Structures are given as C-alpha cells and as structure tokens.
Amino acid sequence: MQIILASQSPRRQELLKRVVPTFTIAPADIDETVGKDGLPAEYVAQMAAQKAAAIAEQSPEALVIGCDTIVALAGEILGKPTSREDGYRMLRLLSGKTHDVYTSVTLKQGEKERSATVHSTVTFYPLTDTEIHAYLDTAEYADKAGAYGIQGQGALLIEAIAGDYYAIMGLPIAKVARLLKEFN
C-alpha cells in the first residue's frame, strides 16, 4: 500500500518514519486561513481533513495522512508567524502563560477516513525581551505554529508540558499508529 504524507514539514517526516518506514511526500496546497475565527480544535481538524482530501483526490488508491498543528491562547489561534515582528508578538503573548496546542491527523484512503485531534498544553517561562530576540535570532520560529519549536532551542522557553510531546512537535505518532491499524 502506498502511503503519502501530505506535509512538507521535516519534523513530521522524521516522526512518521518511526511508524512507517516507507512513504512519499506530497504537500497539500490549501488555504489555511479559512475558518481561523472558529474554535481551535475544529479549525485544526478541518485543516488536516482538507490536506488529506486534496492529496487523496489526486491519488485515490493511496493512504494519505494529512495533519495540522496550531497554538491557541485564550481561544485565539496563533498560526505560523508572517514576520519576525509577528513572531515577537506571539512569543510576548505566550510569555509566562499556559497555552493550548492542538494537532489533528486525518488518514484517508478512497472513501474511508479516520481522524483524531490531540490536545496538549505548554507553559512558557516569563520571557525577557532579550530572551525573545535571542530565540528569534535562531530563525526557528519562522515555520512553526505559535512561533516556536519544542524540539529545538524553543525548549529553553518552556517551563512545563502536559500531553503528547510528539503532537506538540507536529505528529502524534502513537495515535497515527493506532489509526493505521484500521487500514491494514
């Protein structure tokens, strides 16, 4: 069975290799701004499903894995920053607070579709401007929801997590492994 990961994220590719040794990459080109005013869990589930559907339409025999991760603070969705200034704004908002991280995954093959959303929380230390700018200087923030990556230098900003570390990183591998069993 051909498996396609509908993501260009190197982190997701690295994580999926722990579950599936062989797969191809086909990033989905969808509008990720649609529905951003909705509830975070609904938004992330919608994005993962749309990514899987877009690639499954092109490869109906393949098993497609679509995923999305967002950060939310008090219900406000923080996607990927559009600039260094936007990254600063996000990190300033997250400083000293606990926020939500939602990662949704959708597996689709033909008409069969299975989805799951994993909710975790992350607490940031109170951050100084110097700490924020030092992190922004690493450029890690650029392609990450909430402007940080837990697996890199962003770990230095984090006081505590509750939930699934791999989901915070971008792919809940234990959940994916269980969903894959439904397709074998």
From Swiss-Prot:
Task: Return the InterPro entries for the record.
Answer: ITPase-like_fam (IPR029001), Maf-like (IPR003697)
Q: Which residues does the Swiss-Prot or TrEMBL record annotate as the active site? A: D68 (proton acceptor)
Q: Which UniProt keywords apply?
A: Cytoplasm, Hydrolase, Nucleotide metabolism
Please list the GO terms describing molecular function: dTTP diphosphatase activity; UTP diphosphatase activity
Please classify the protein's predominant subcellular localization into one broad category. cytoplasm
A GO cellular-component term linked to this record: cytoplasm
Q: What cofactor is this protein dependent on?
A: a divalent metal cation
Catalysed reactions, semicolon-separated: dTTP + H2O = dTMP + diphosphate + H(+); UTP + H2O = UMP + diphosphate + H(+)
Q: What is its EC number?
A: 3.6.1.9
One Gene Ontology term of the biological-process aspect is: nucleotide metabolic process
Alphabetical list of Pfam families matching this protein = Maf
What does the function comment of this entry state? Nucleoside triphosphate pyrophosphatase that hydrolyzes dTTP and UTP. May have a dual role in cell division arrest and in preventing the incorporation of modified nucleotides into cellular nucleic acids.
Which HAMAP family does the entry link to?
Maf
Q: Which family does it belong to?
A: Belongs to the Maf family. YhdE subfamily.
Identification of the protein by name: dTTP/UTP pyrophosphatase
